[in-house]
Amino acid sequence: MELSEHEEDAGDVGGGCSSPPTPPHRVLTSAAPETIRCRYHECLRNHAAASGGHVVDGCGEFMPASTEEPLACAACGCHRSFHRRDPSPGRAGAARLLQLHLPASINSRAPPALLLPPAAAASKQGLPFPGYGTPSGGTGTTTASSSDERLRPSPVQPRRRSRTTFTREQKEQMLAFAERVGWRIQRQEEATVEHFCAQVGVRRQALKVWMHNNKHSFKQKQQQENRQEQQQ
């Protein structure tokens, strides 16, 4: 009888202090983040950006140069950031992880275009890449002919030779000297020519060119004057 009363008291005490059992919490366990291994494909570096064109080196895949320089490509020498990057095949979780963190409006789009660099995405869709179309960096289309014209160096303009001018007195003295030597400078007359050039103030080459250019005109003029004198 005493045992039963003790059990009842214990039951009353337990009933006053105890609280209703809390339901077990559902622990959400997330899978360990999967490491995303990226592959770097062809090199997209524009080697003709300075001239306004678009020329790539043709490197098809990034290969580390050495352990000391792992970010330099052994094939083309460019930095790894110039190569097109995408996750390795079979890593569907990486694409899924990217879609979970993007808004719904962006998730509705095709994921491959989001994973590609702007230059690669533009080349796949056939769109002009900004910065290569127009000189101001717009989105204008660039034809092959315009690219060739930009890459083709402009022809070098020949330097125009300055024309030597003579005074009236110099022309008269050169005419008299040319008639005296027969409009031709002989080798044995080099000393005479040098003395005349120093006296008149002209260069030897300028005197020679003047005699060559005016030889026929002065001869024709002299012949006409002789004919007129004979007719009179």
UniProtKB/Swiss-Prot annotation:
Residues 159-222 bind DNA. It is found in: Nucleus. A zinc finger (ZF-HD dimerization-type) spans 40-86. The keyword NADP does not apply. InterPro entries: Homeodomain-like_sf (IPR009057), Homeodomain_ZF_HD (IPR006455), ZF_HD_homeobox_Cys/His_dimer (IPR006456). One of its GO terms (biological process) is regulation of developmental process. GO terms for molecular function: DNA-binding transcription factor activity; transcription cis-regulatory region binding; zinc ion binding. Residues 1-25, 126-170 are annotated as: Disordered. Keywords: DNA-binding, Homeobox, Metal-binding, Nucleus, Transcription, Transcription regulation, Zinc, Zinc-finger. Pfam families: ZF-HD_dimer. The homeodomain differs form the typical one by having namely 4 instead of 3 extra amino acids inserted in the loop between helix 1 and helix 2. Homo- and heterodimer with other ZFHD proteins. Putative transcription factor. This is Zinc-finger homeodomain protein 5.
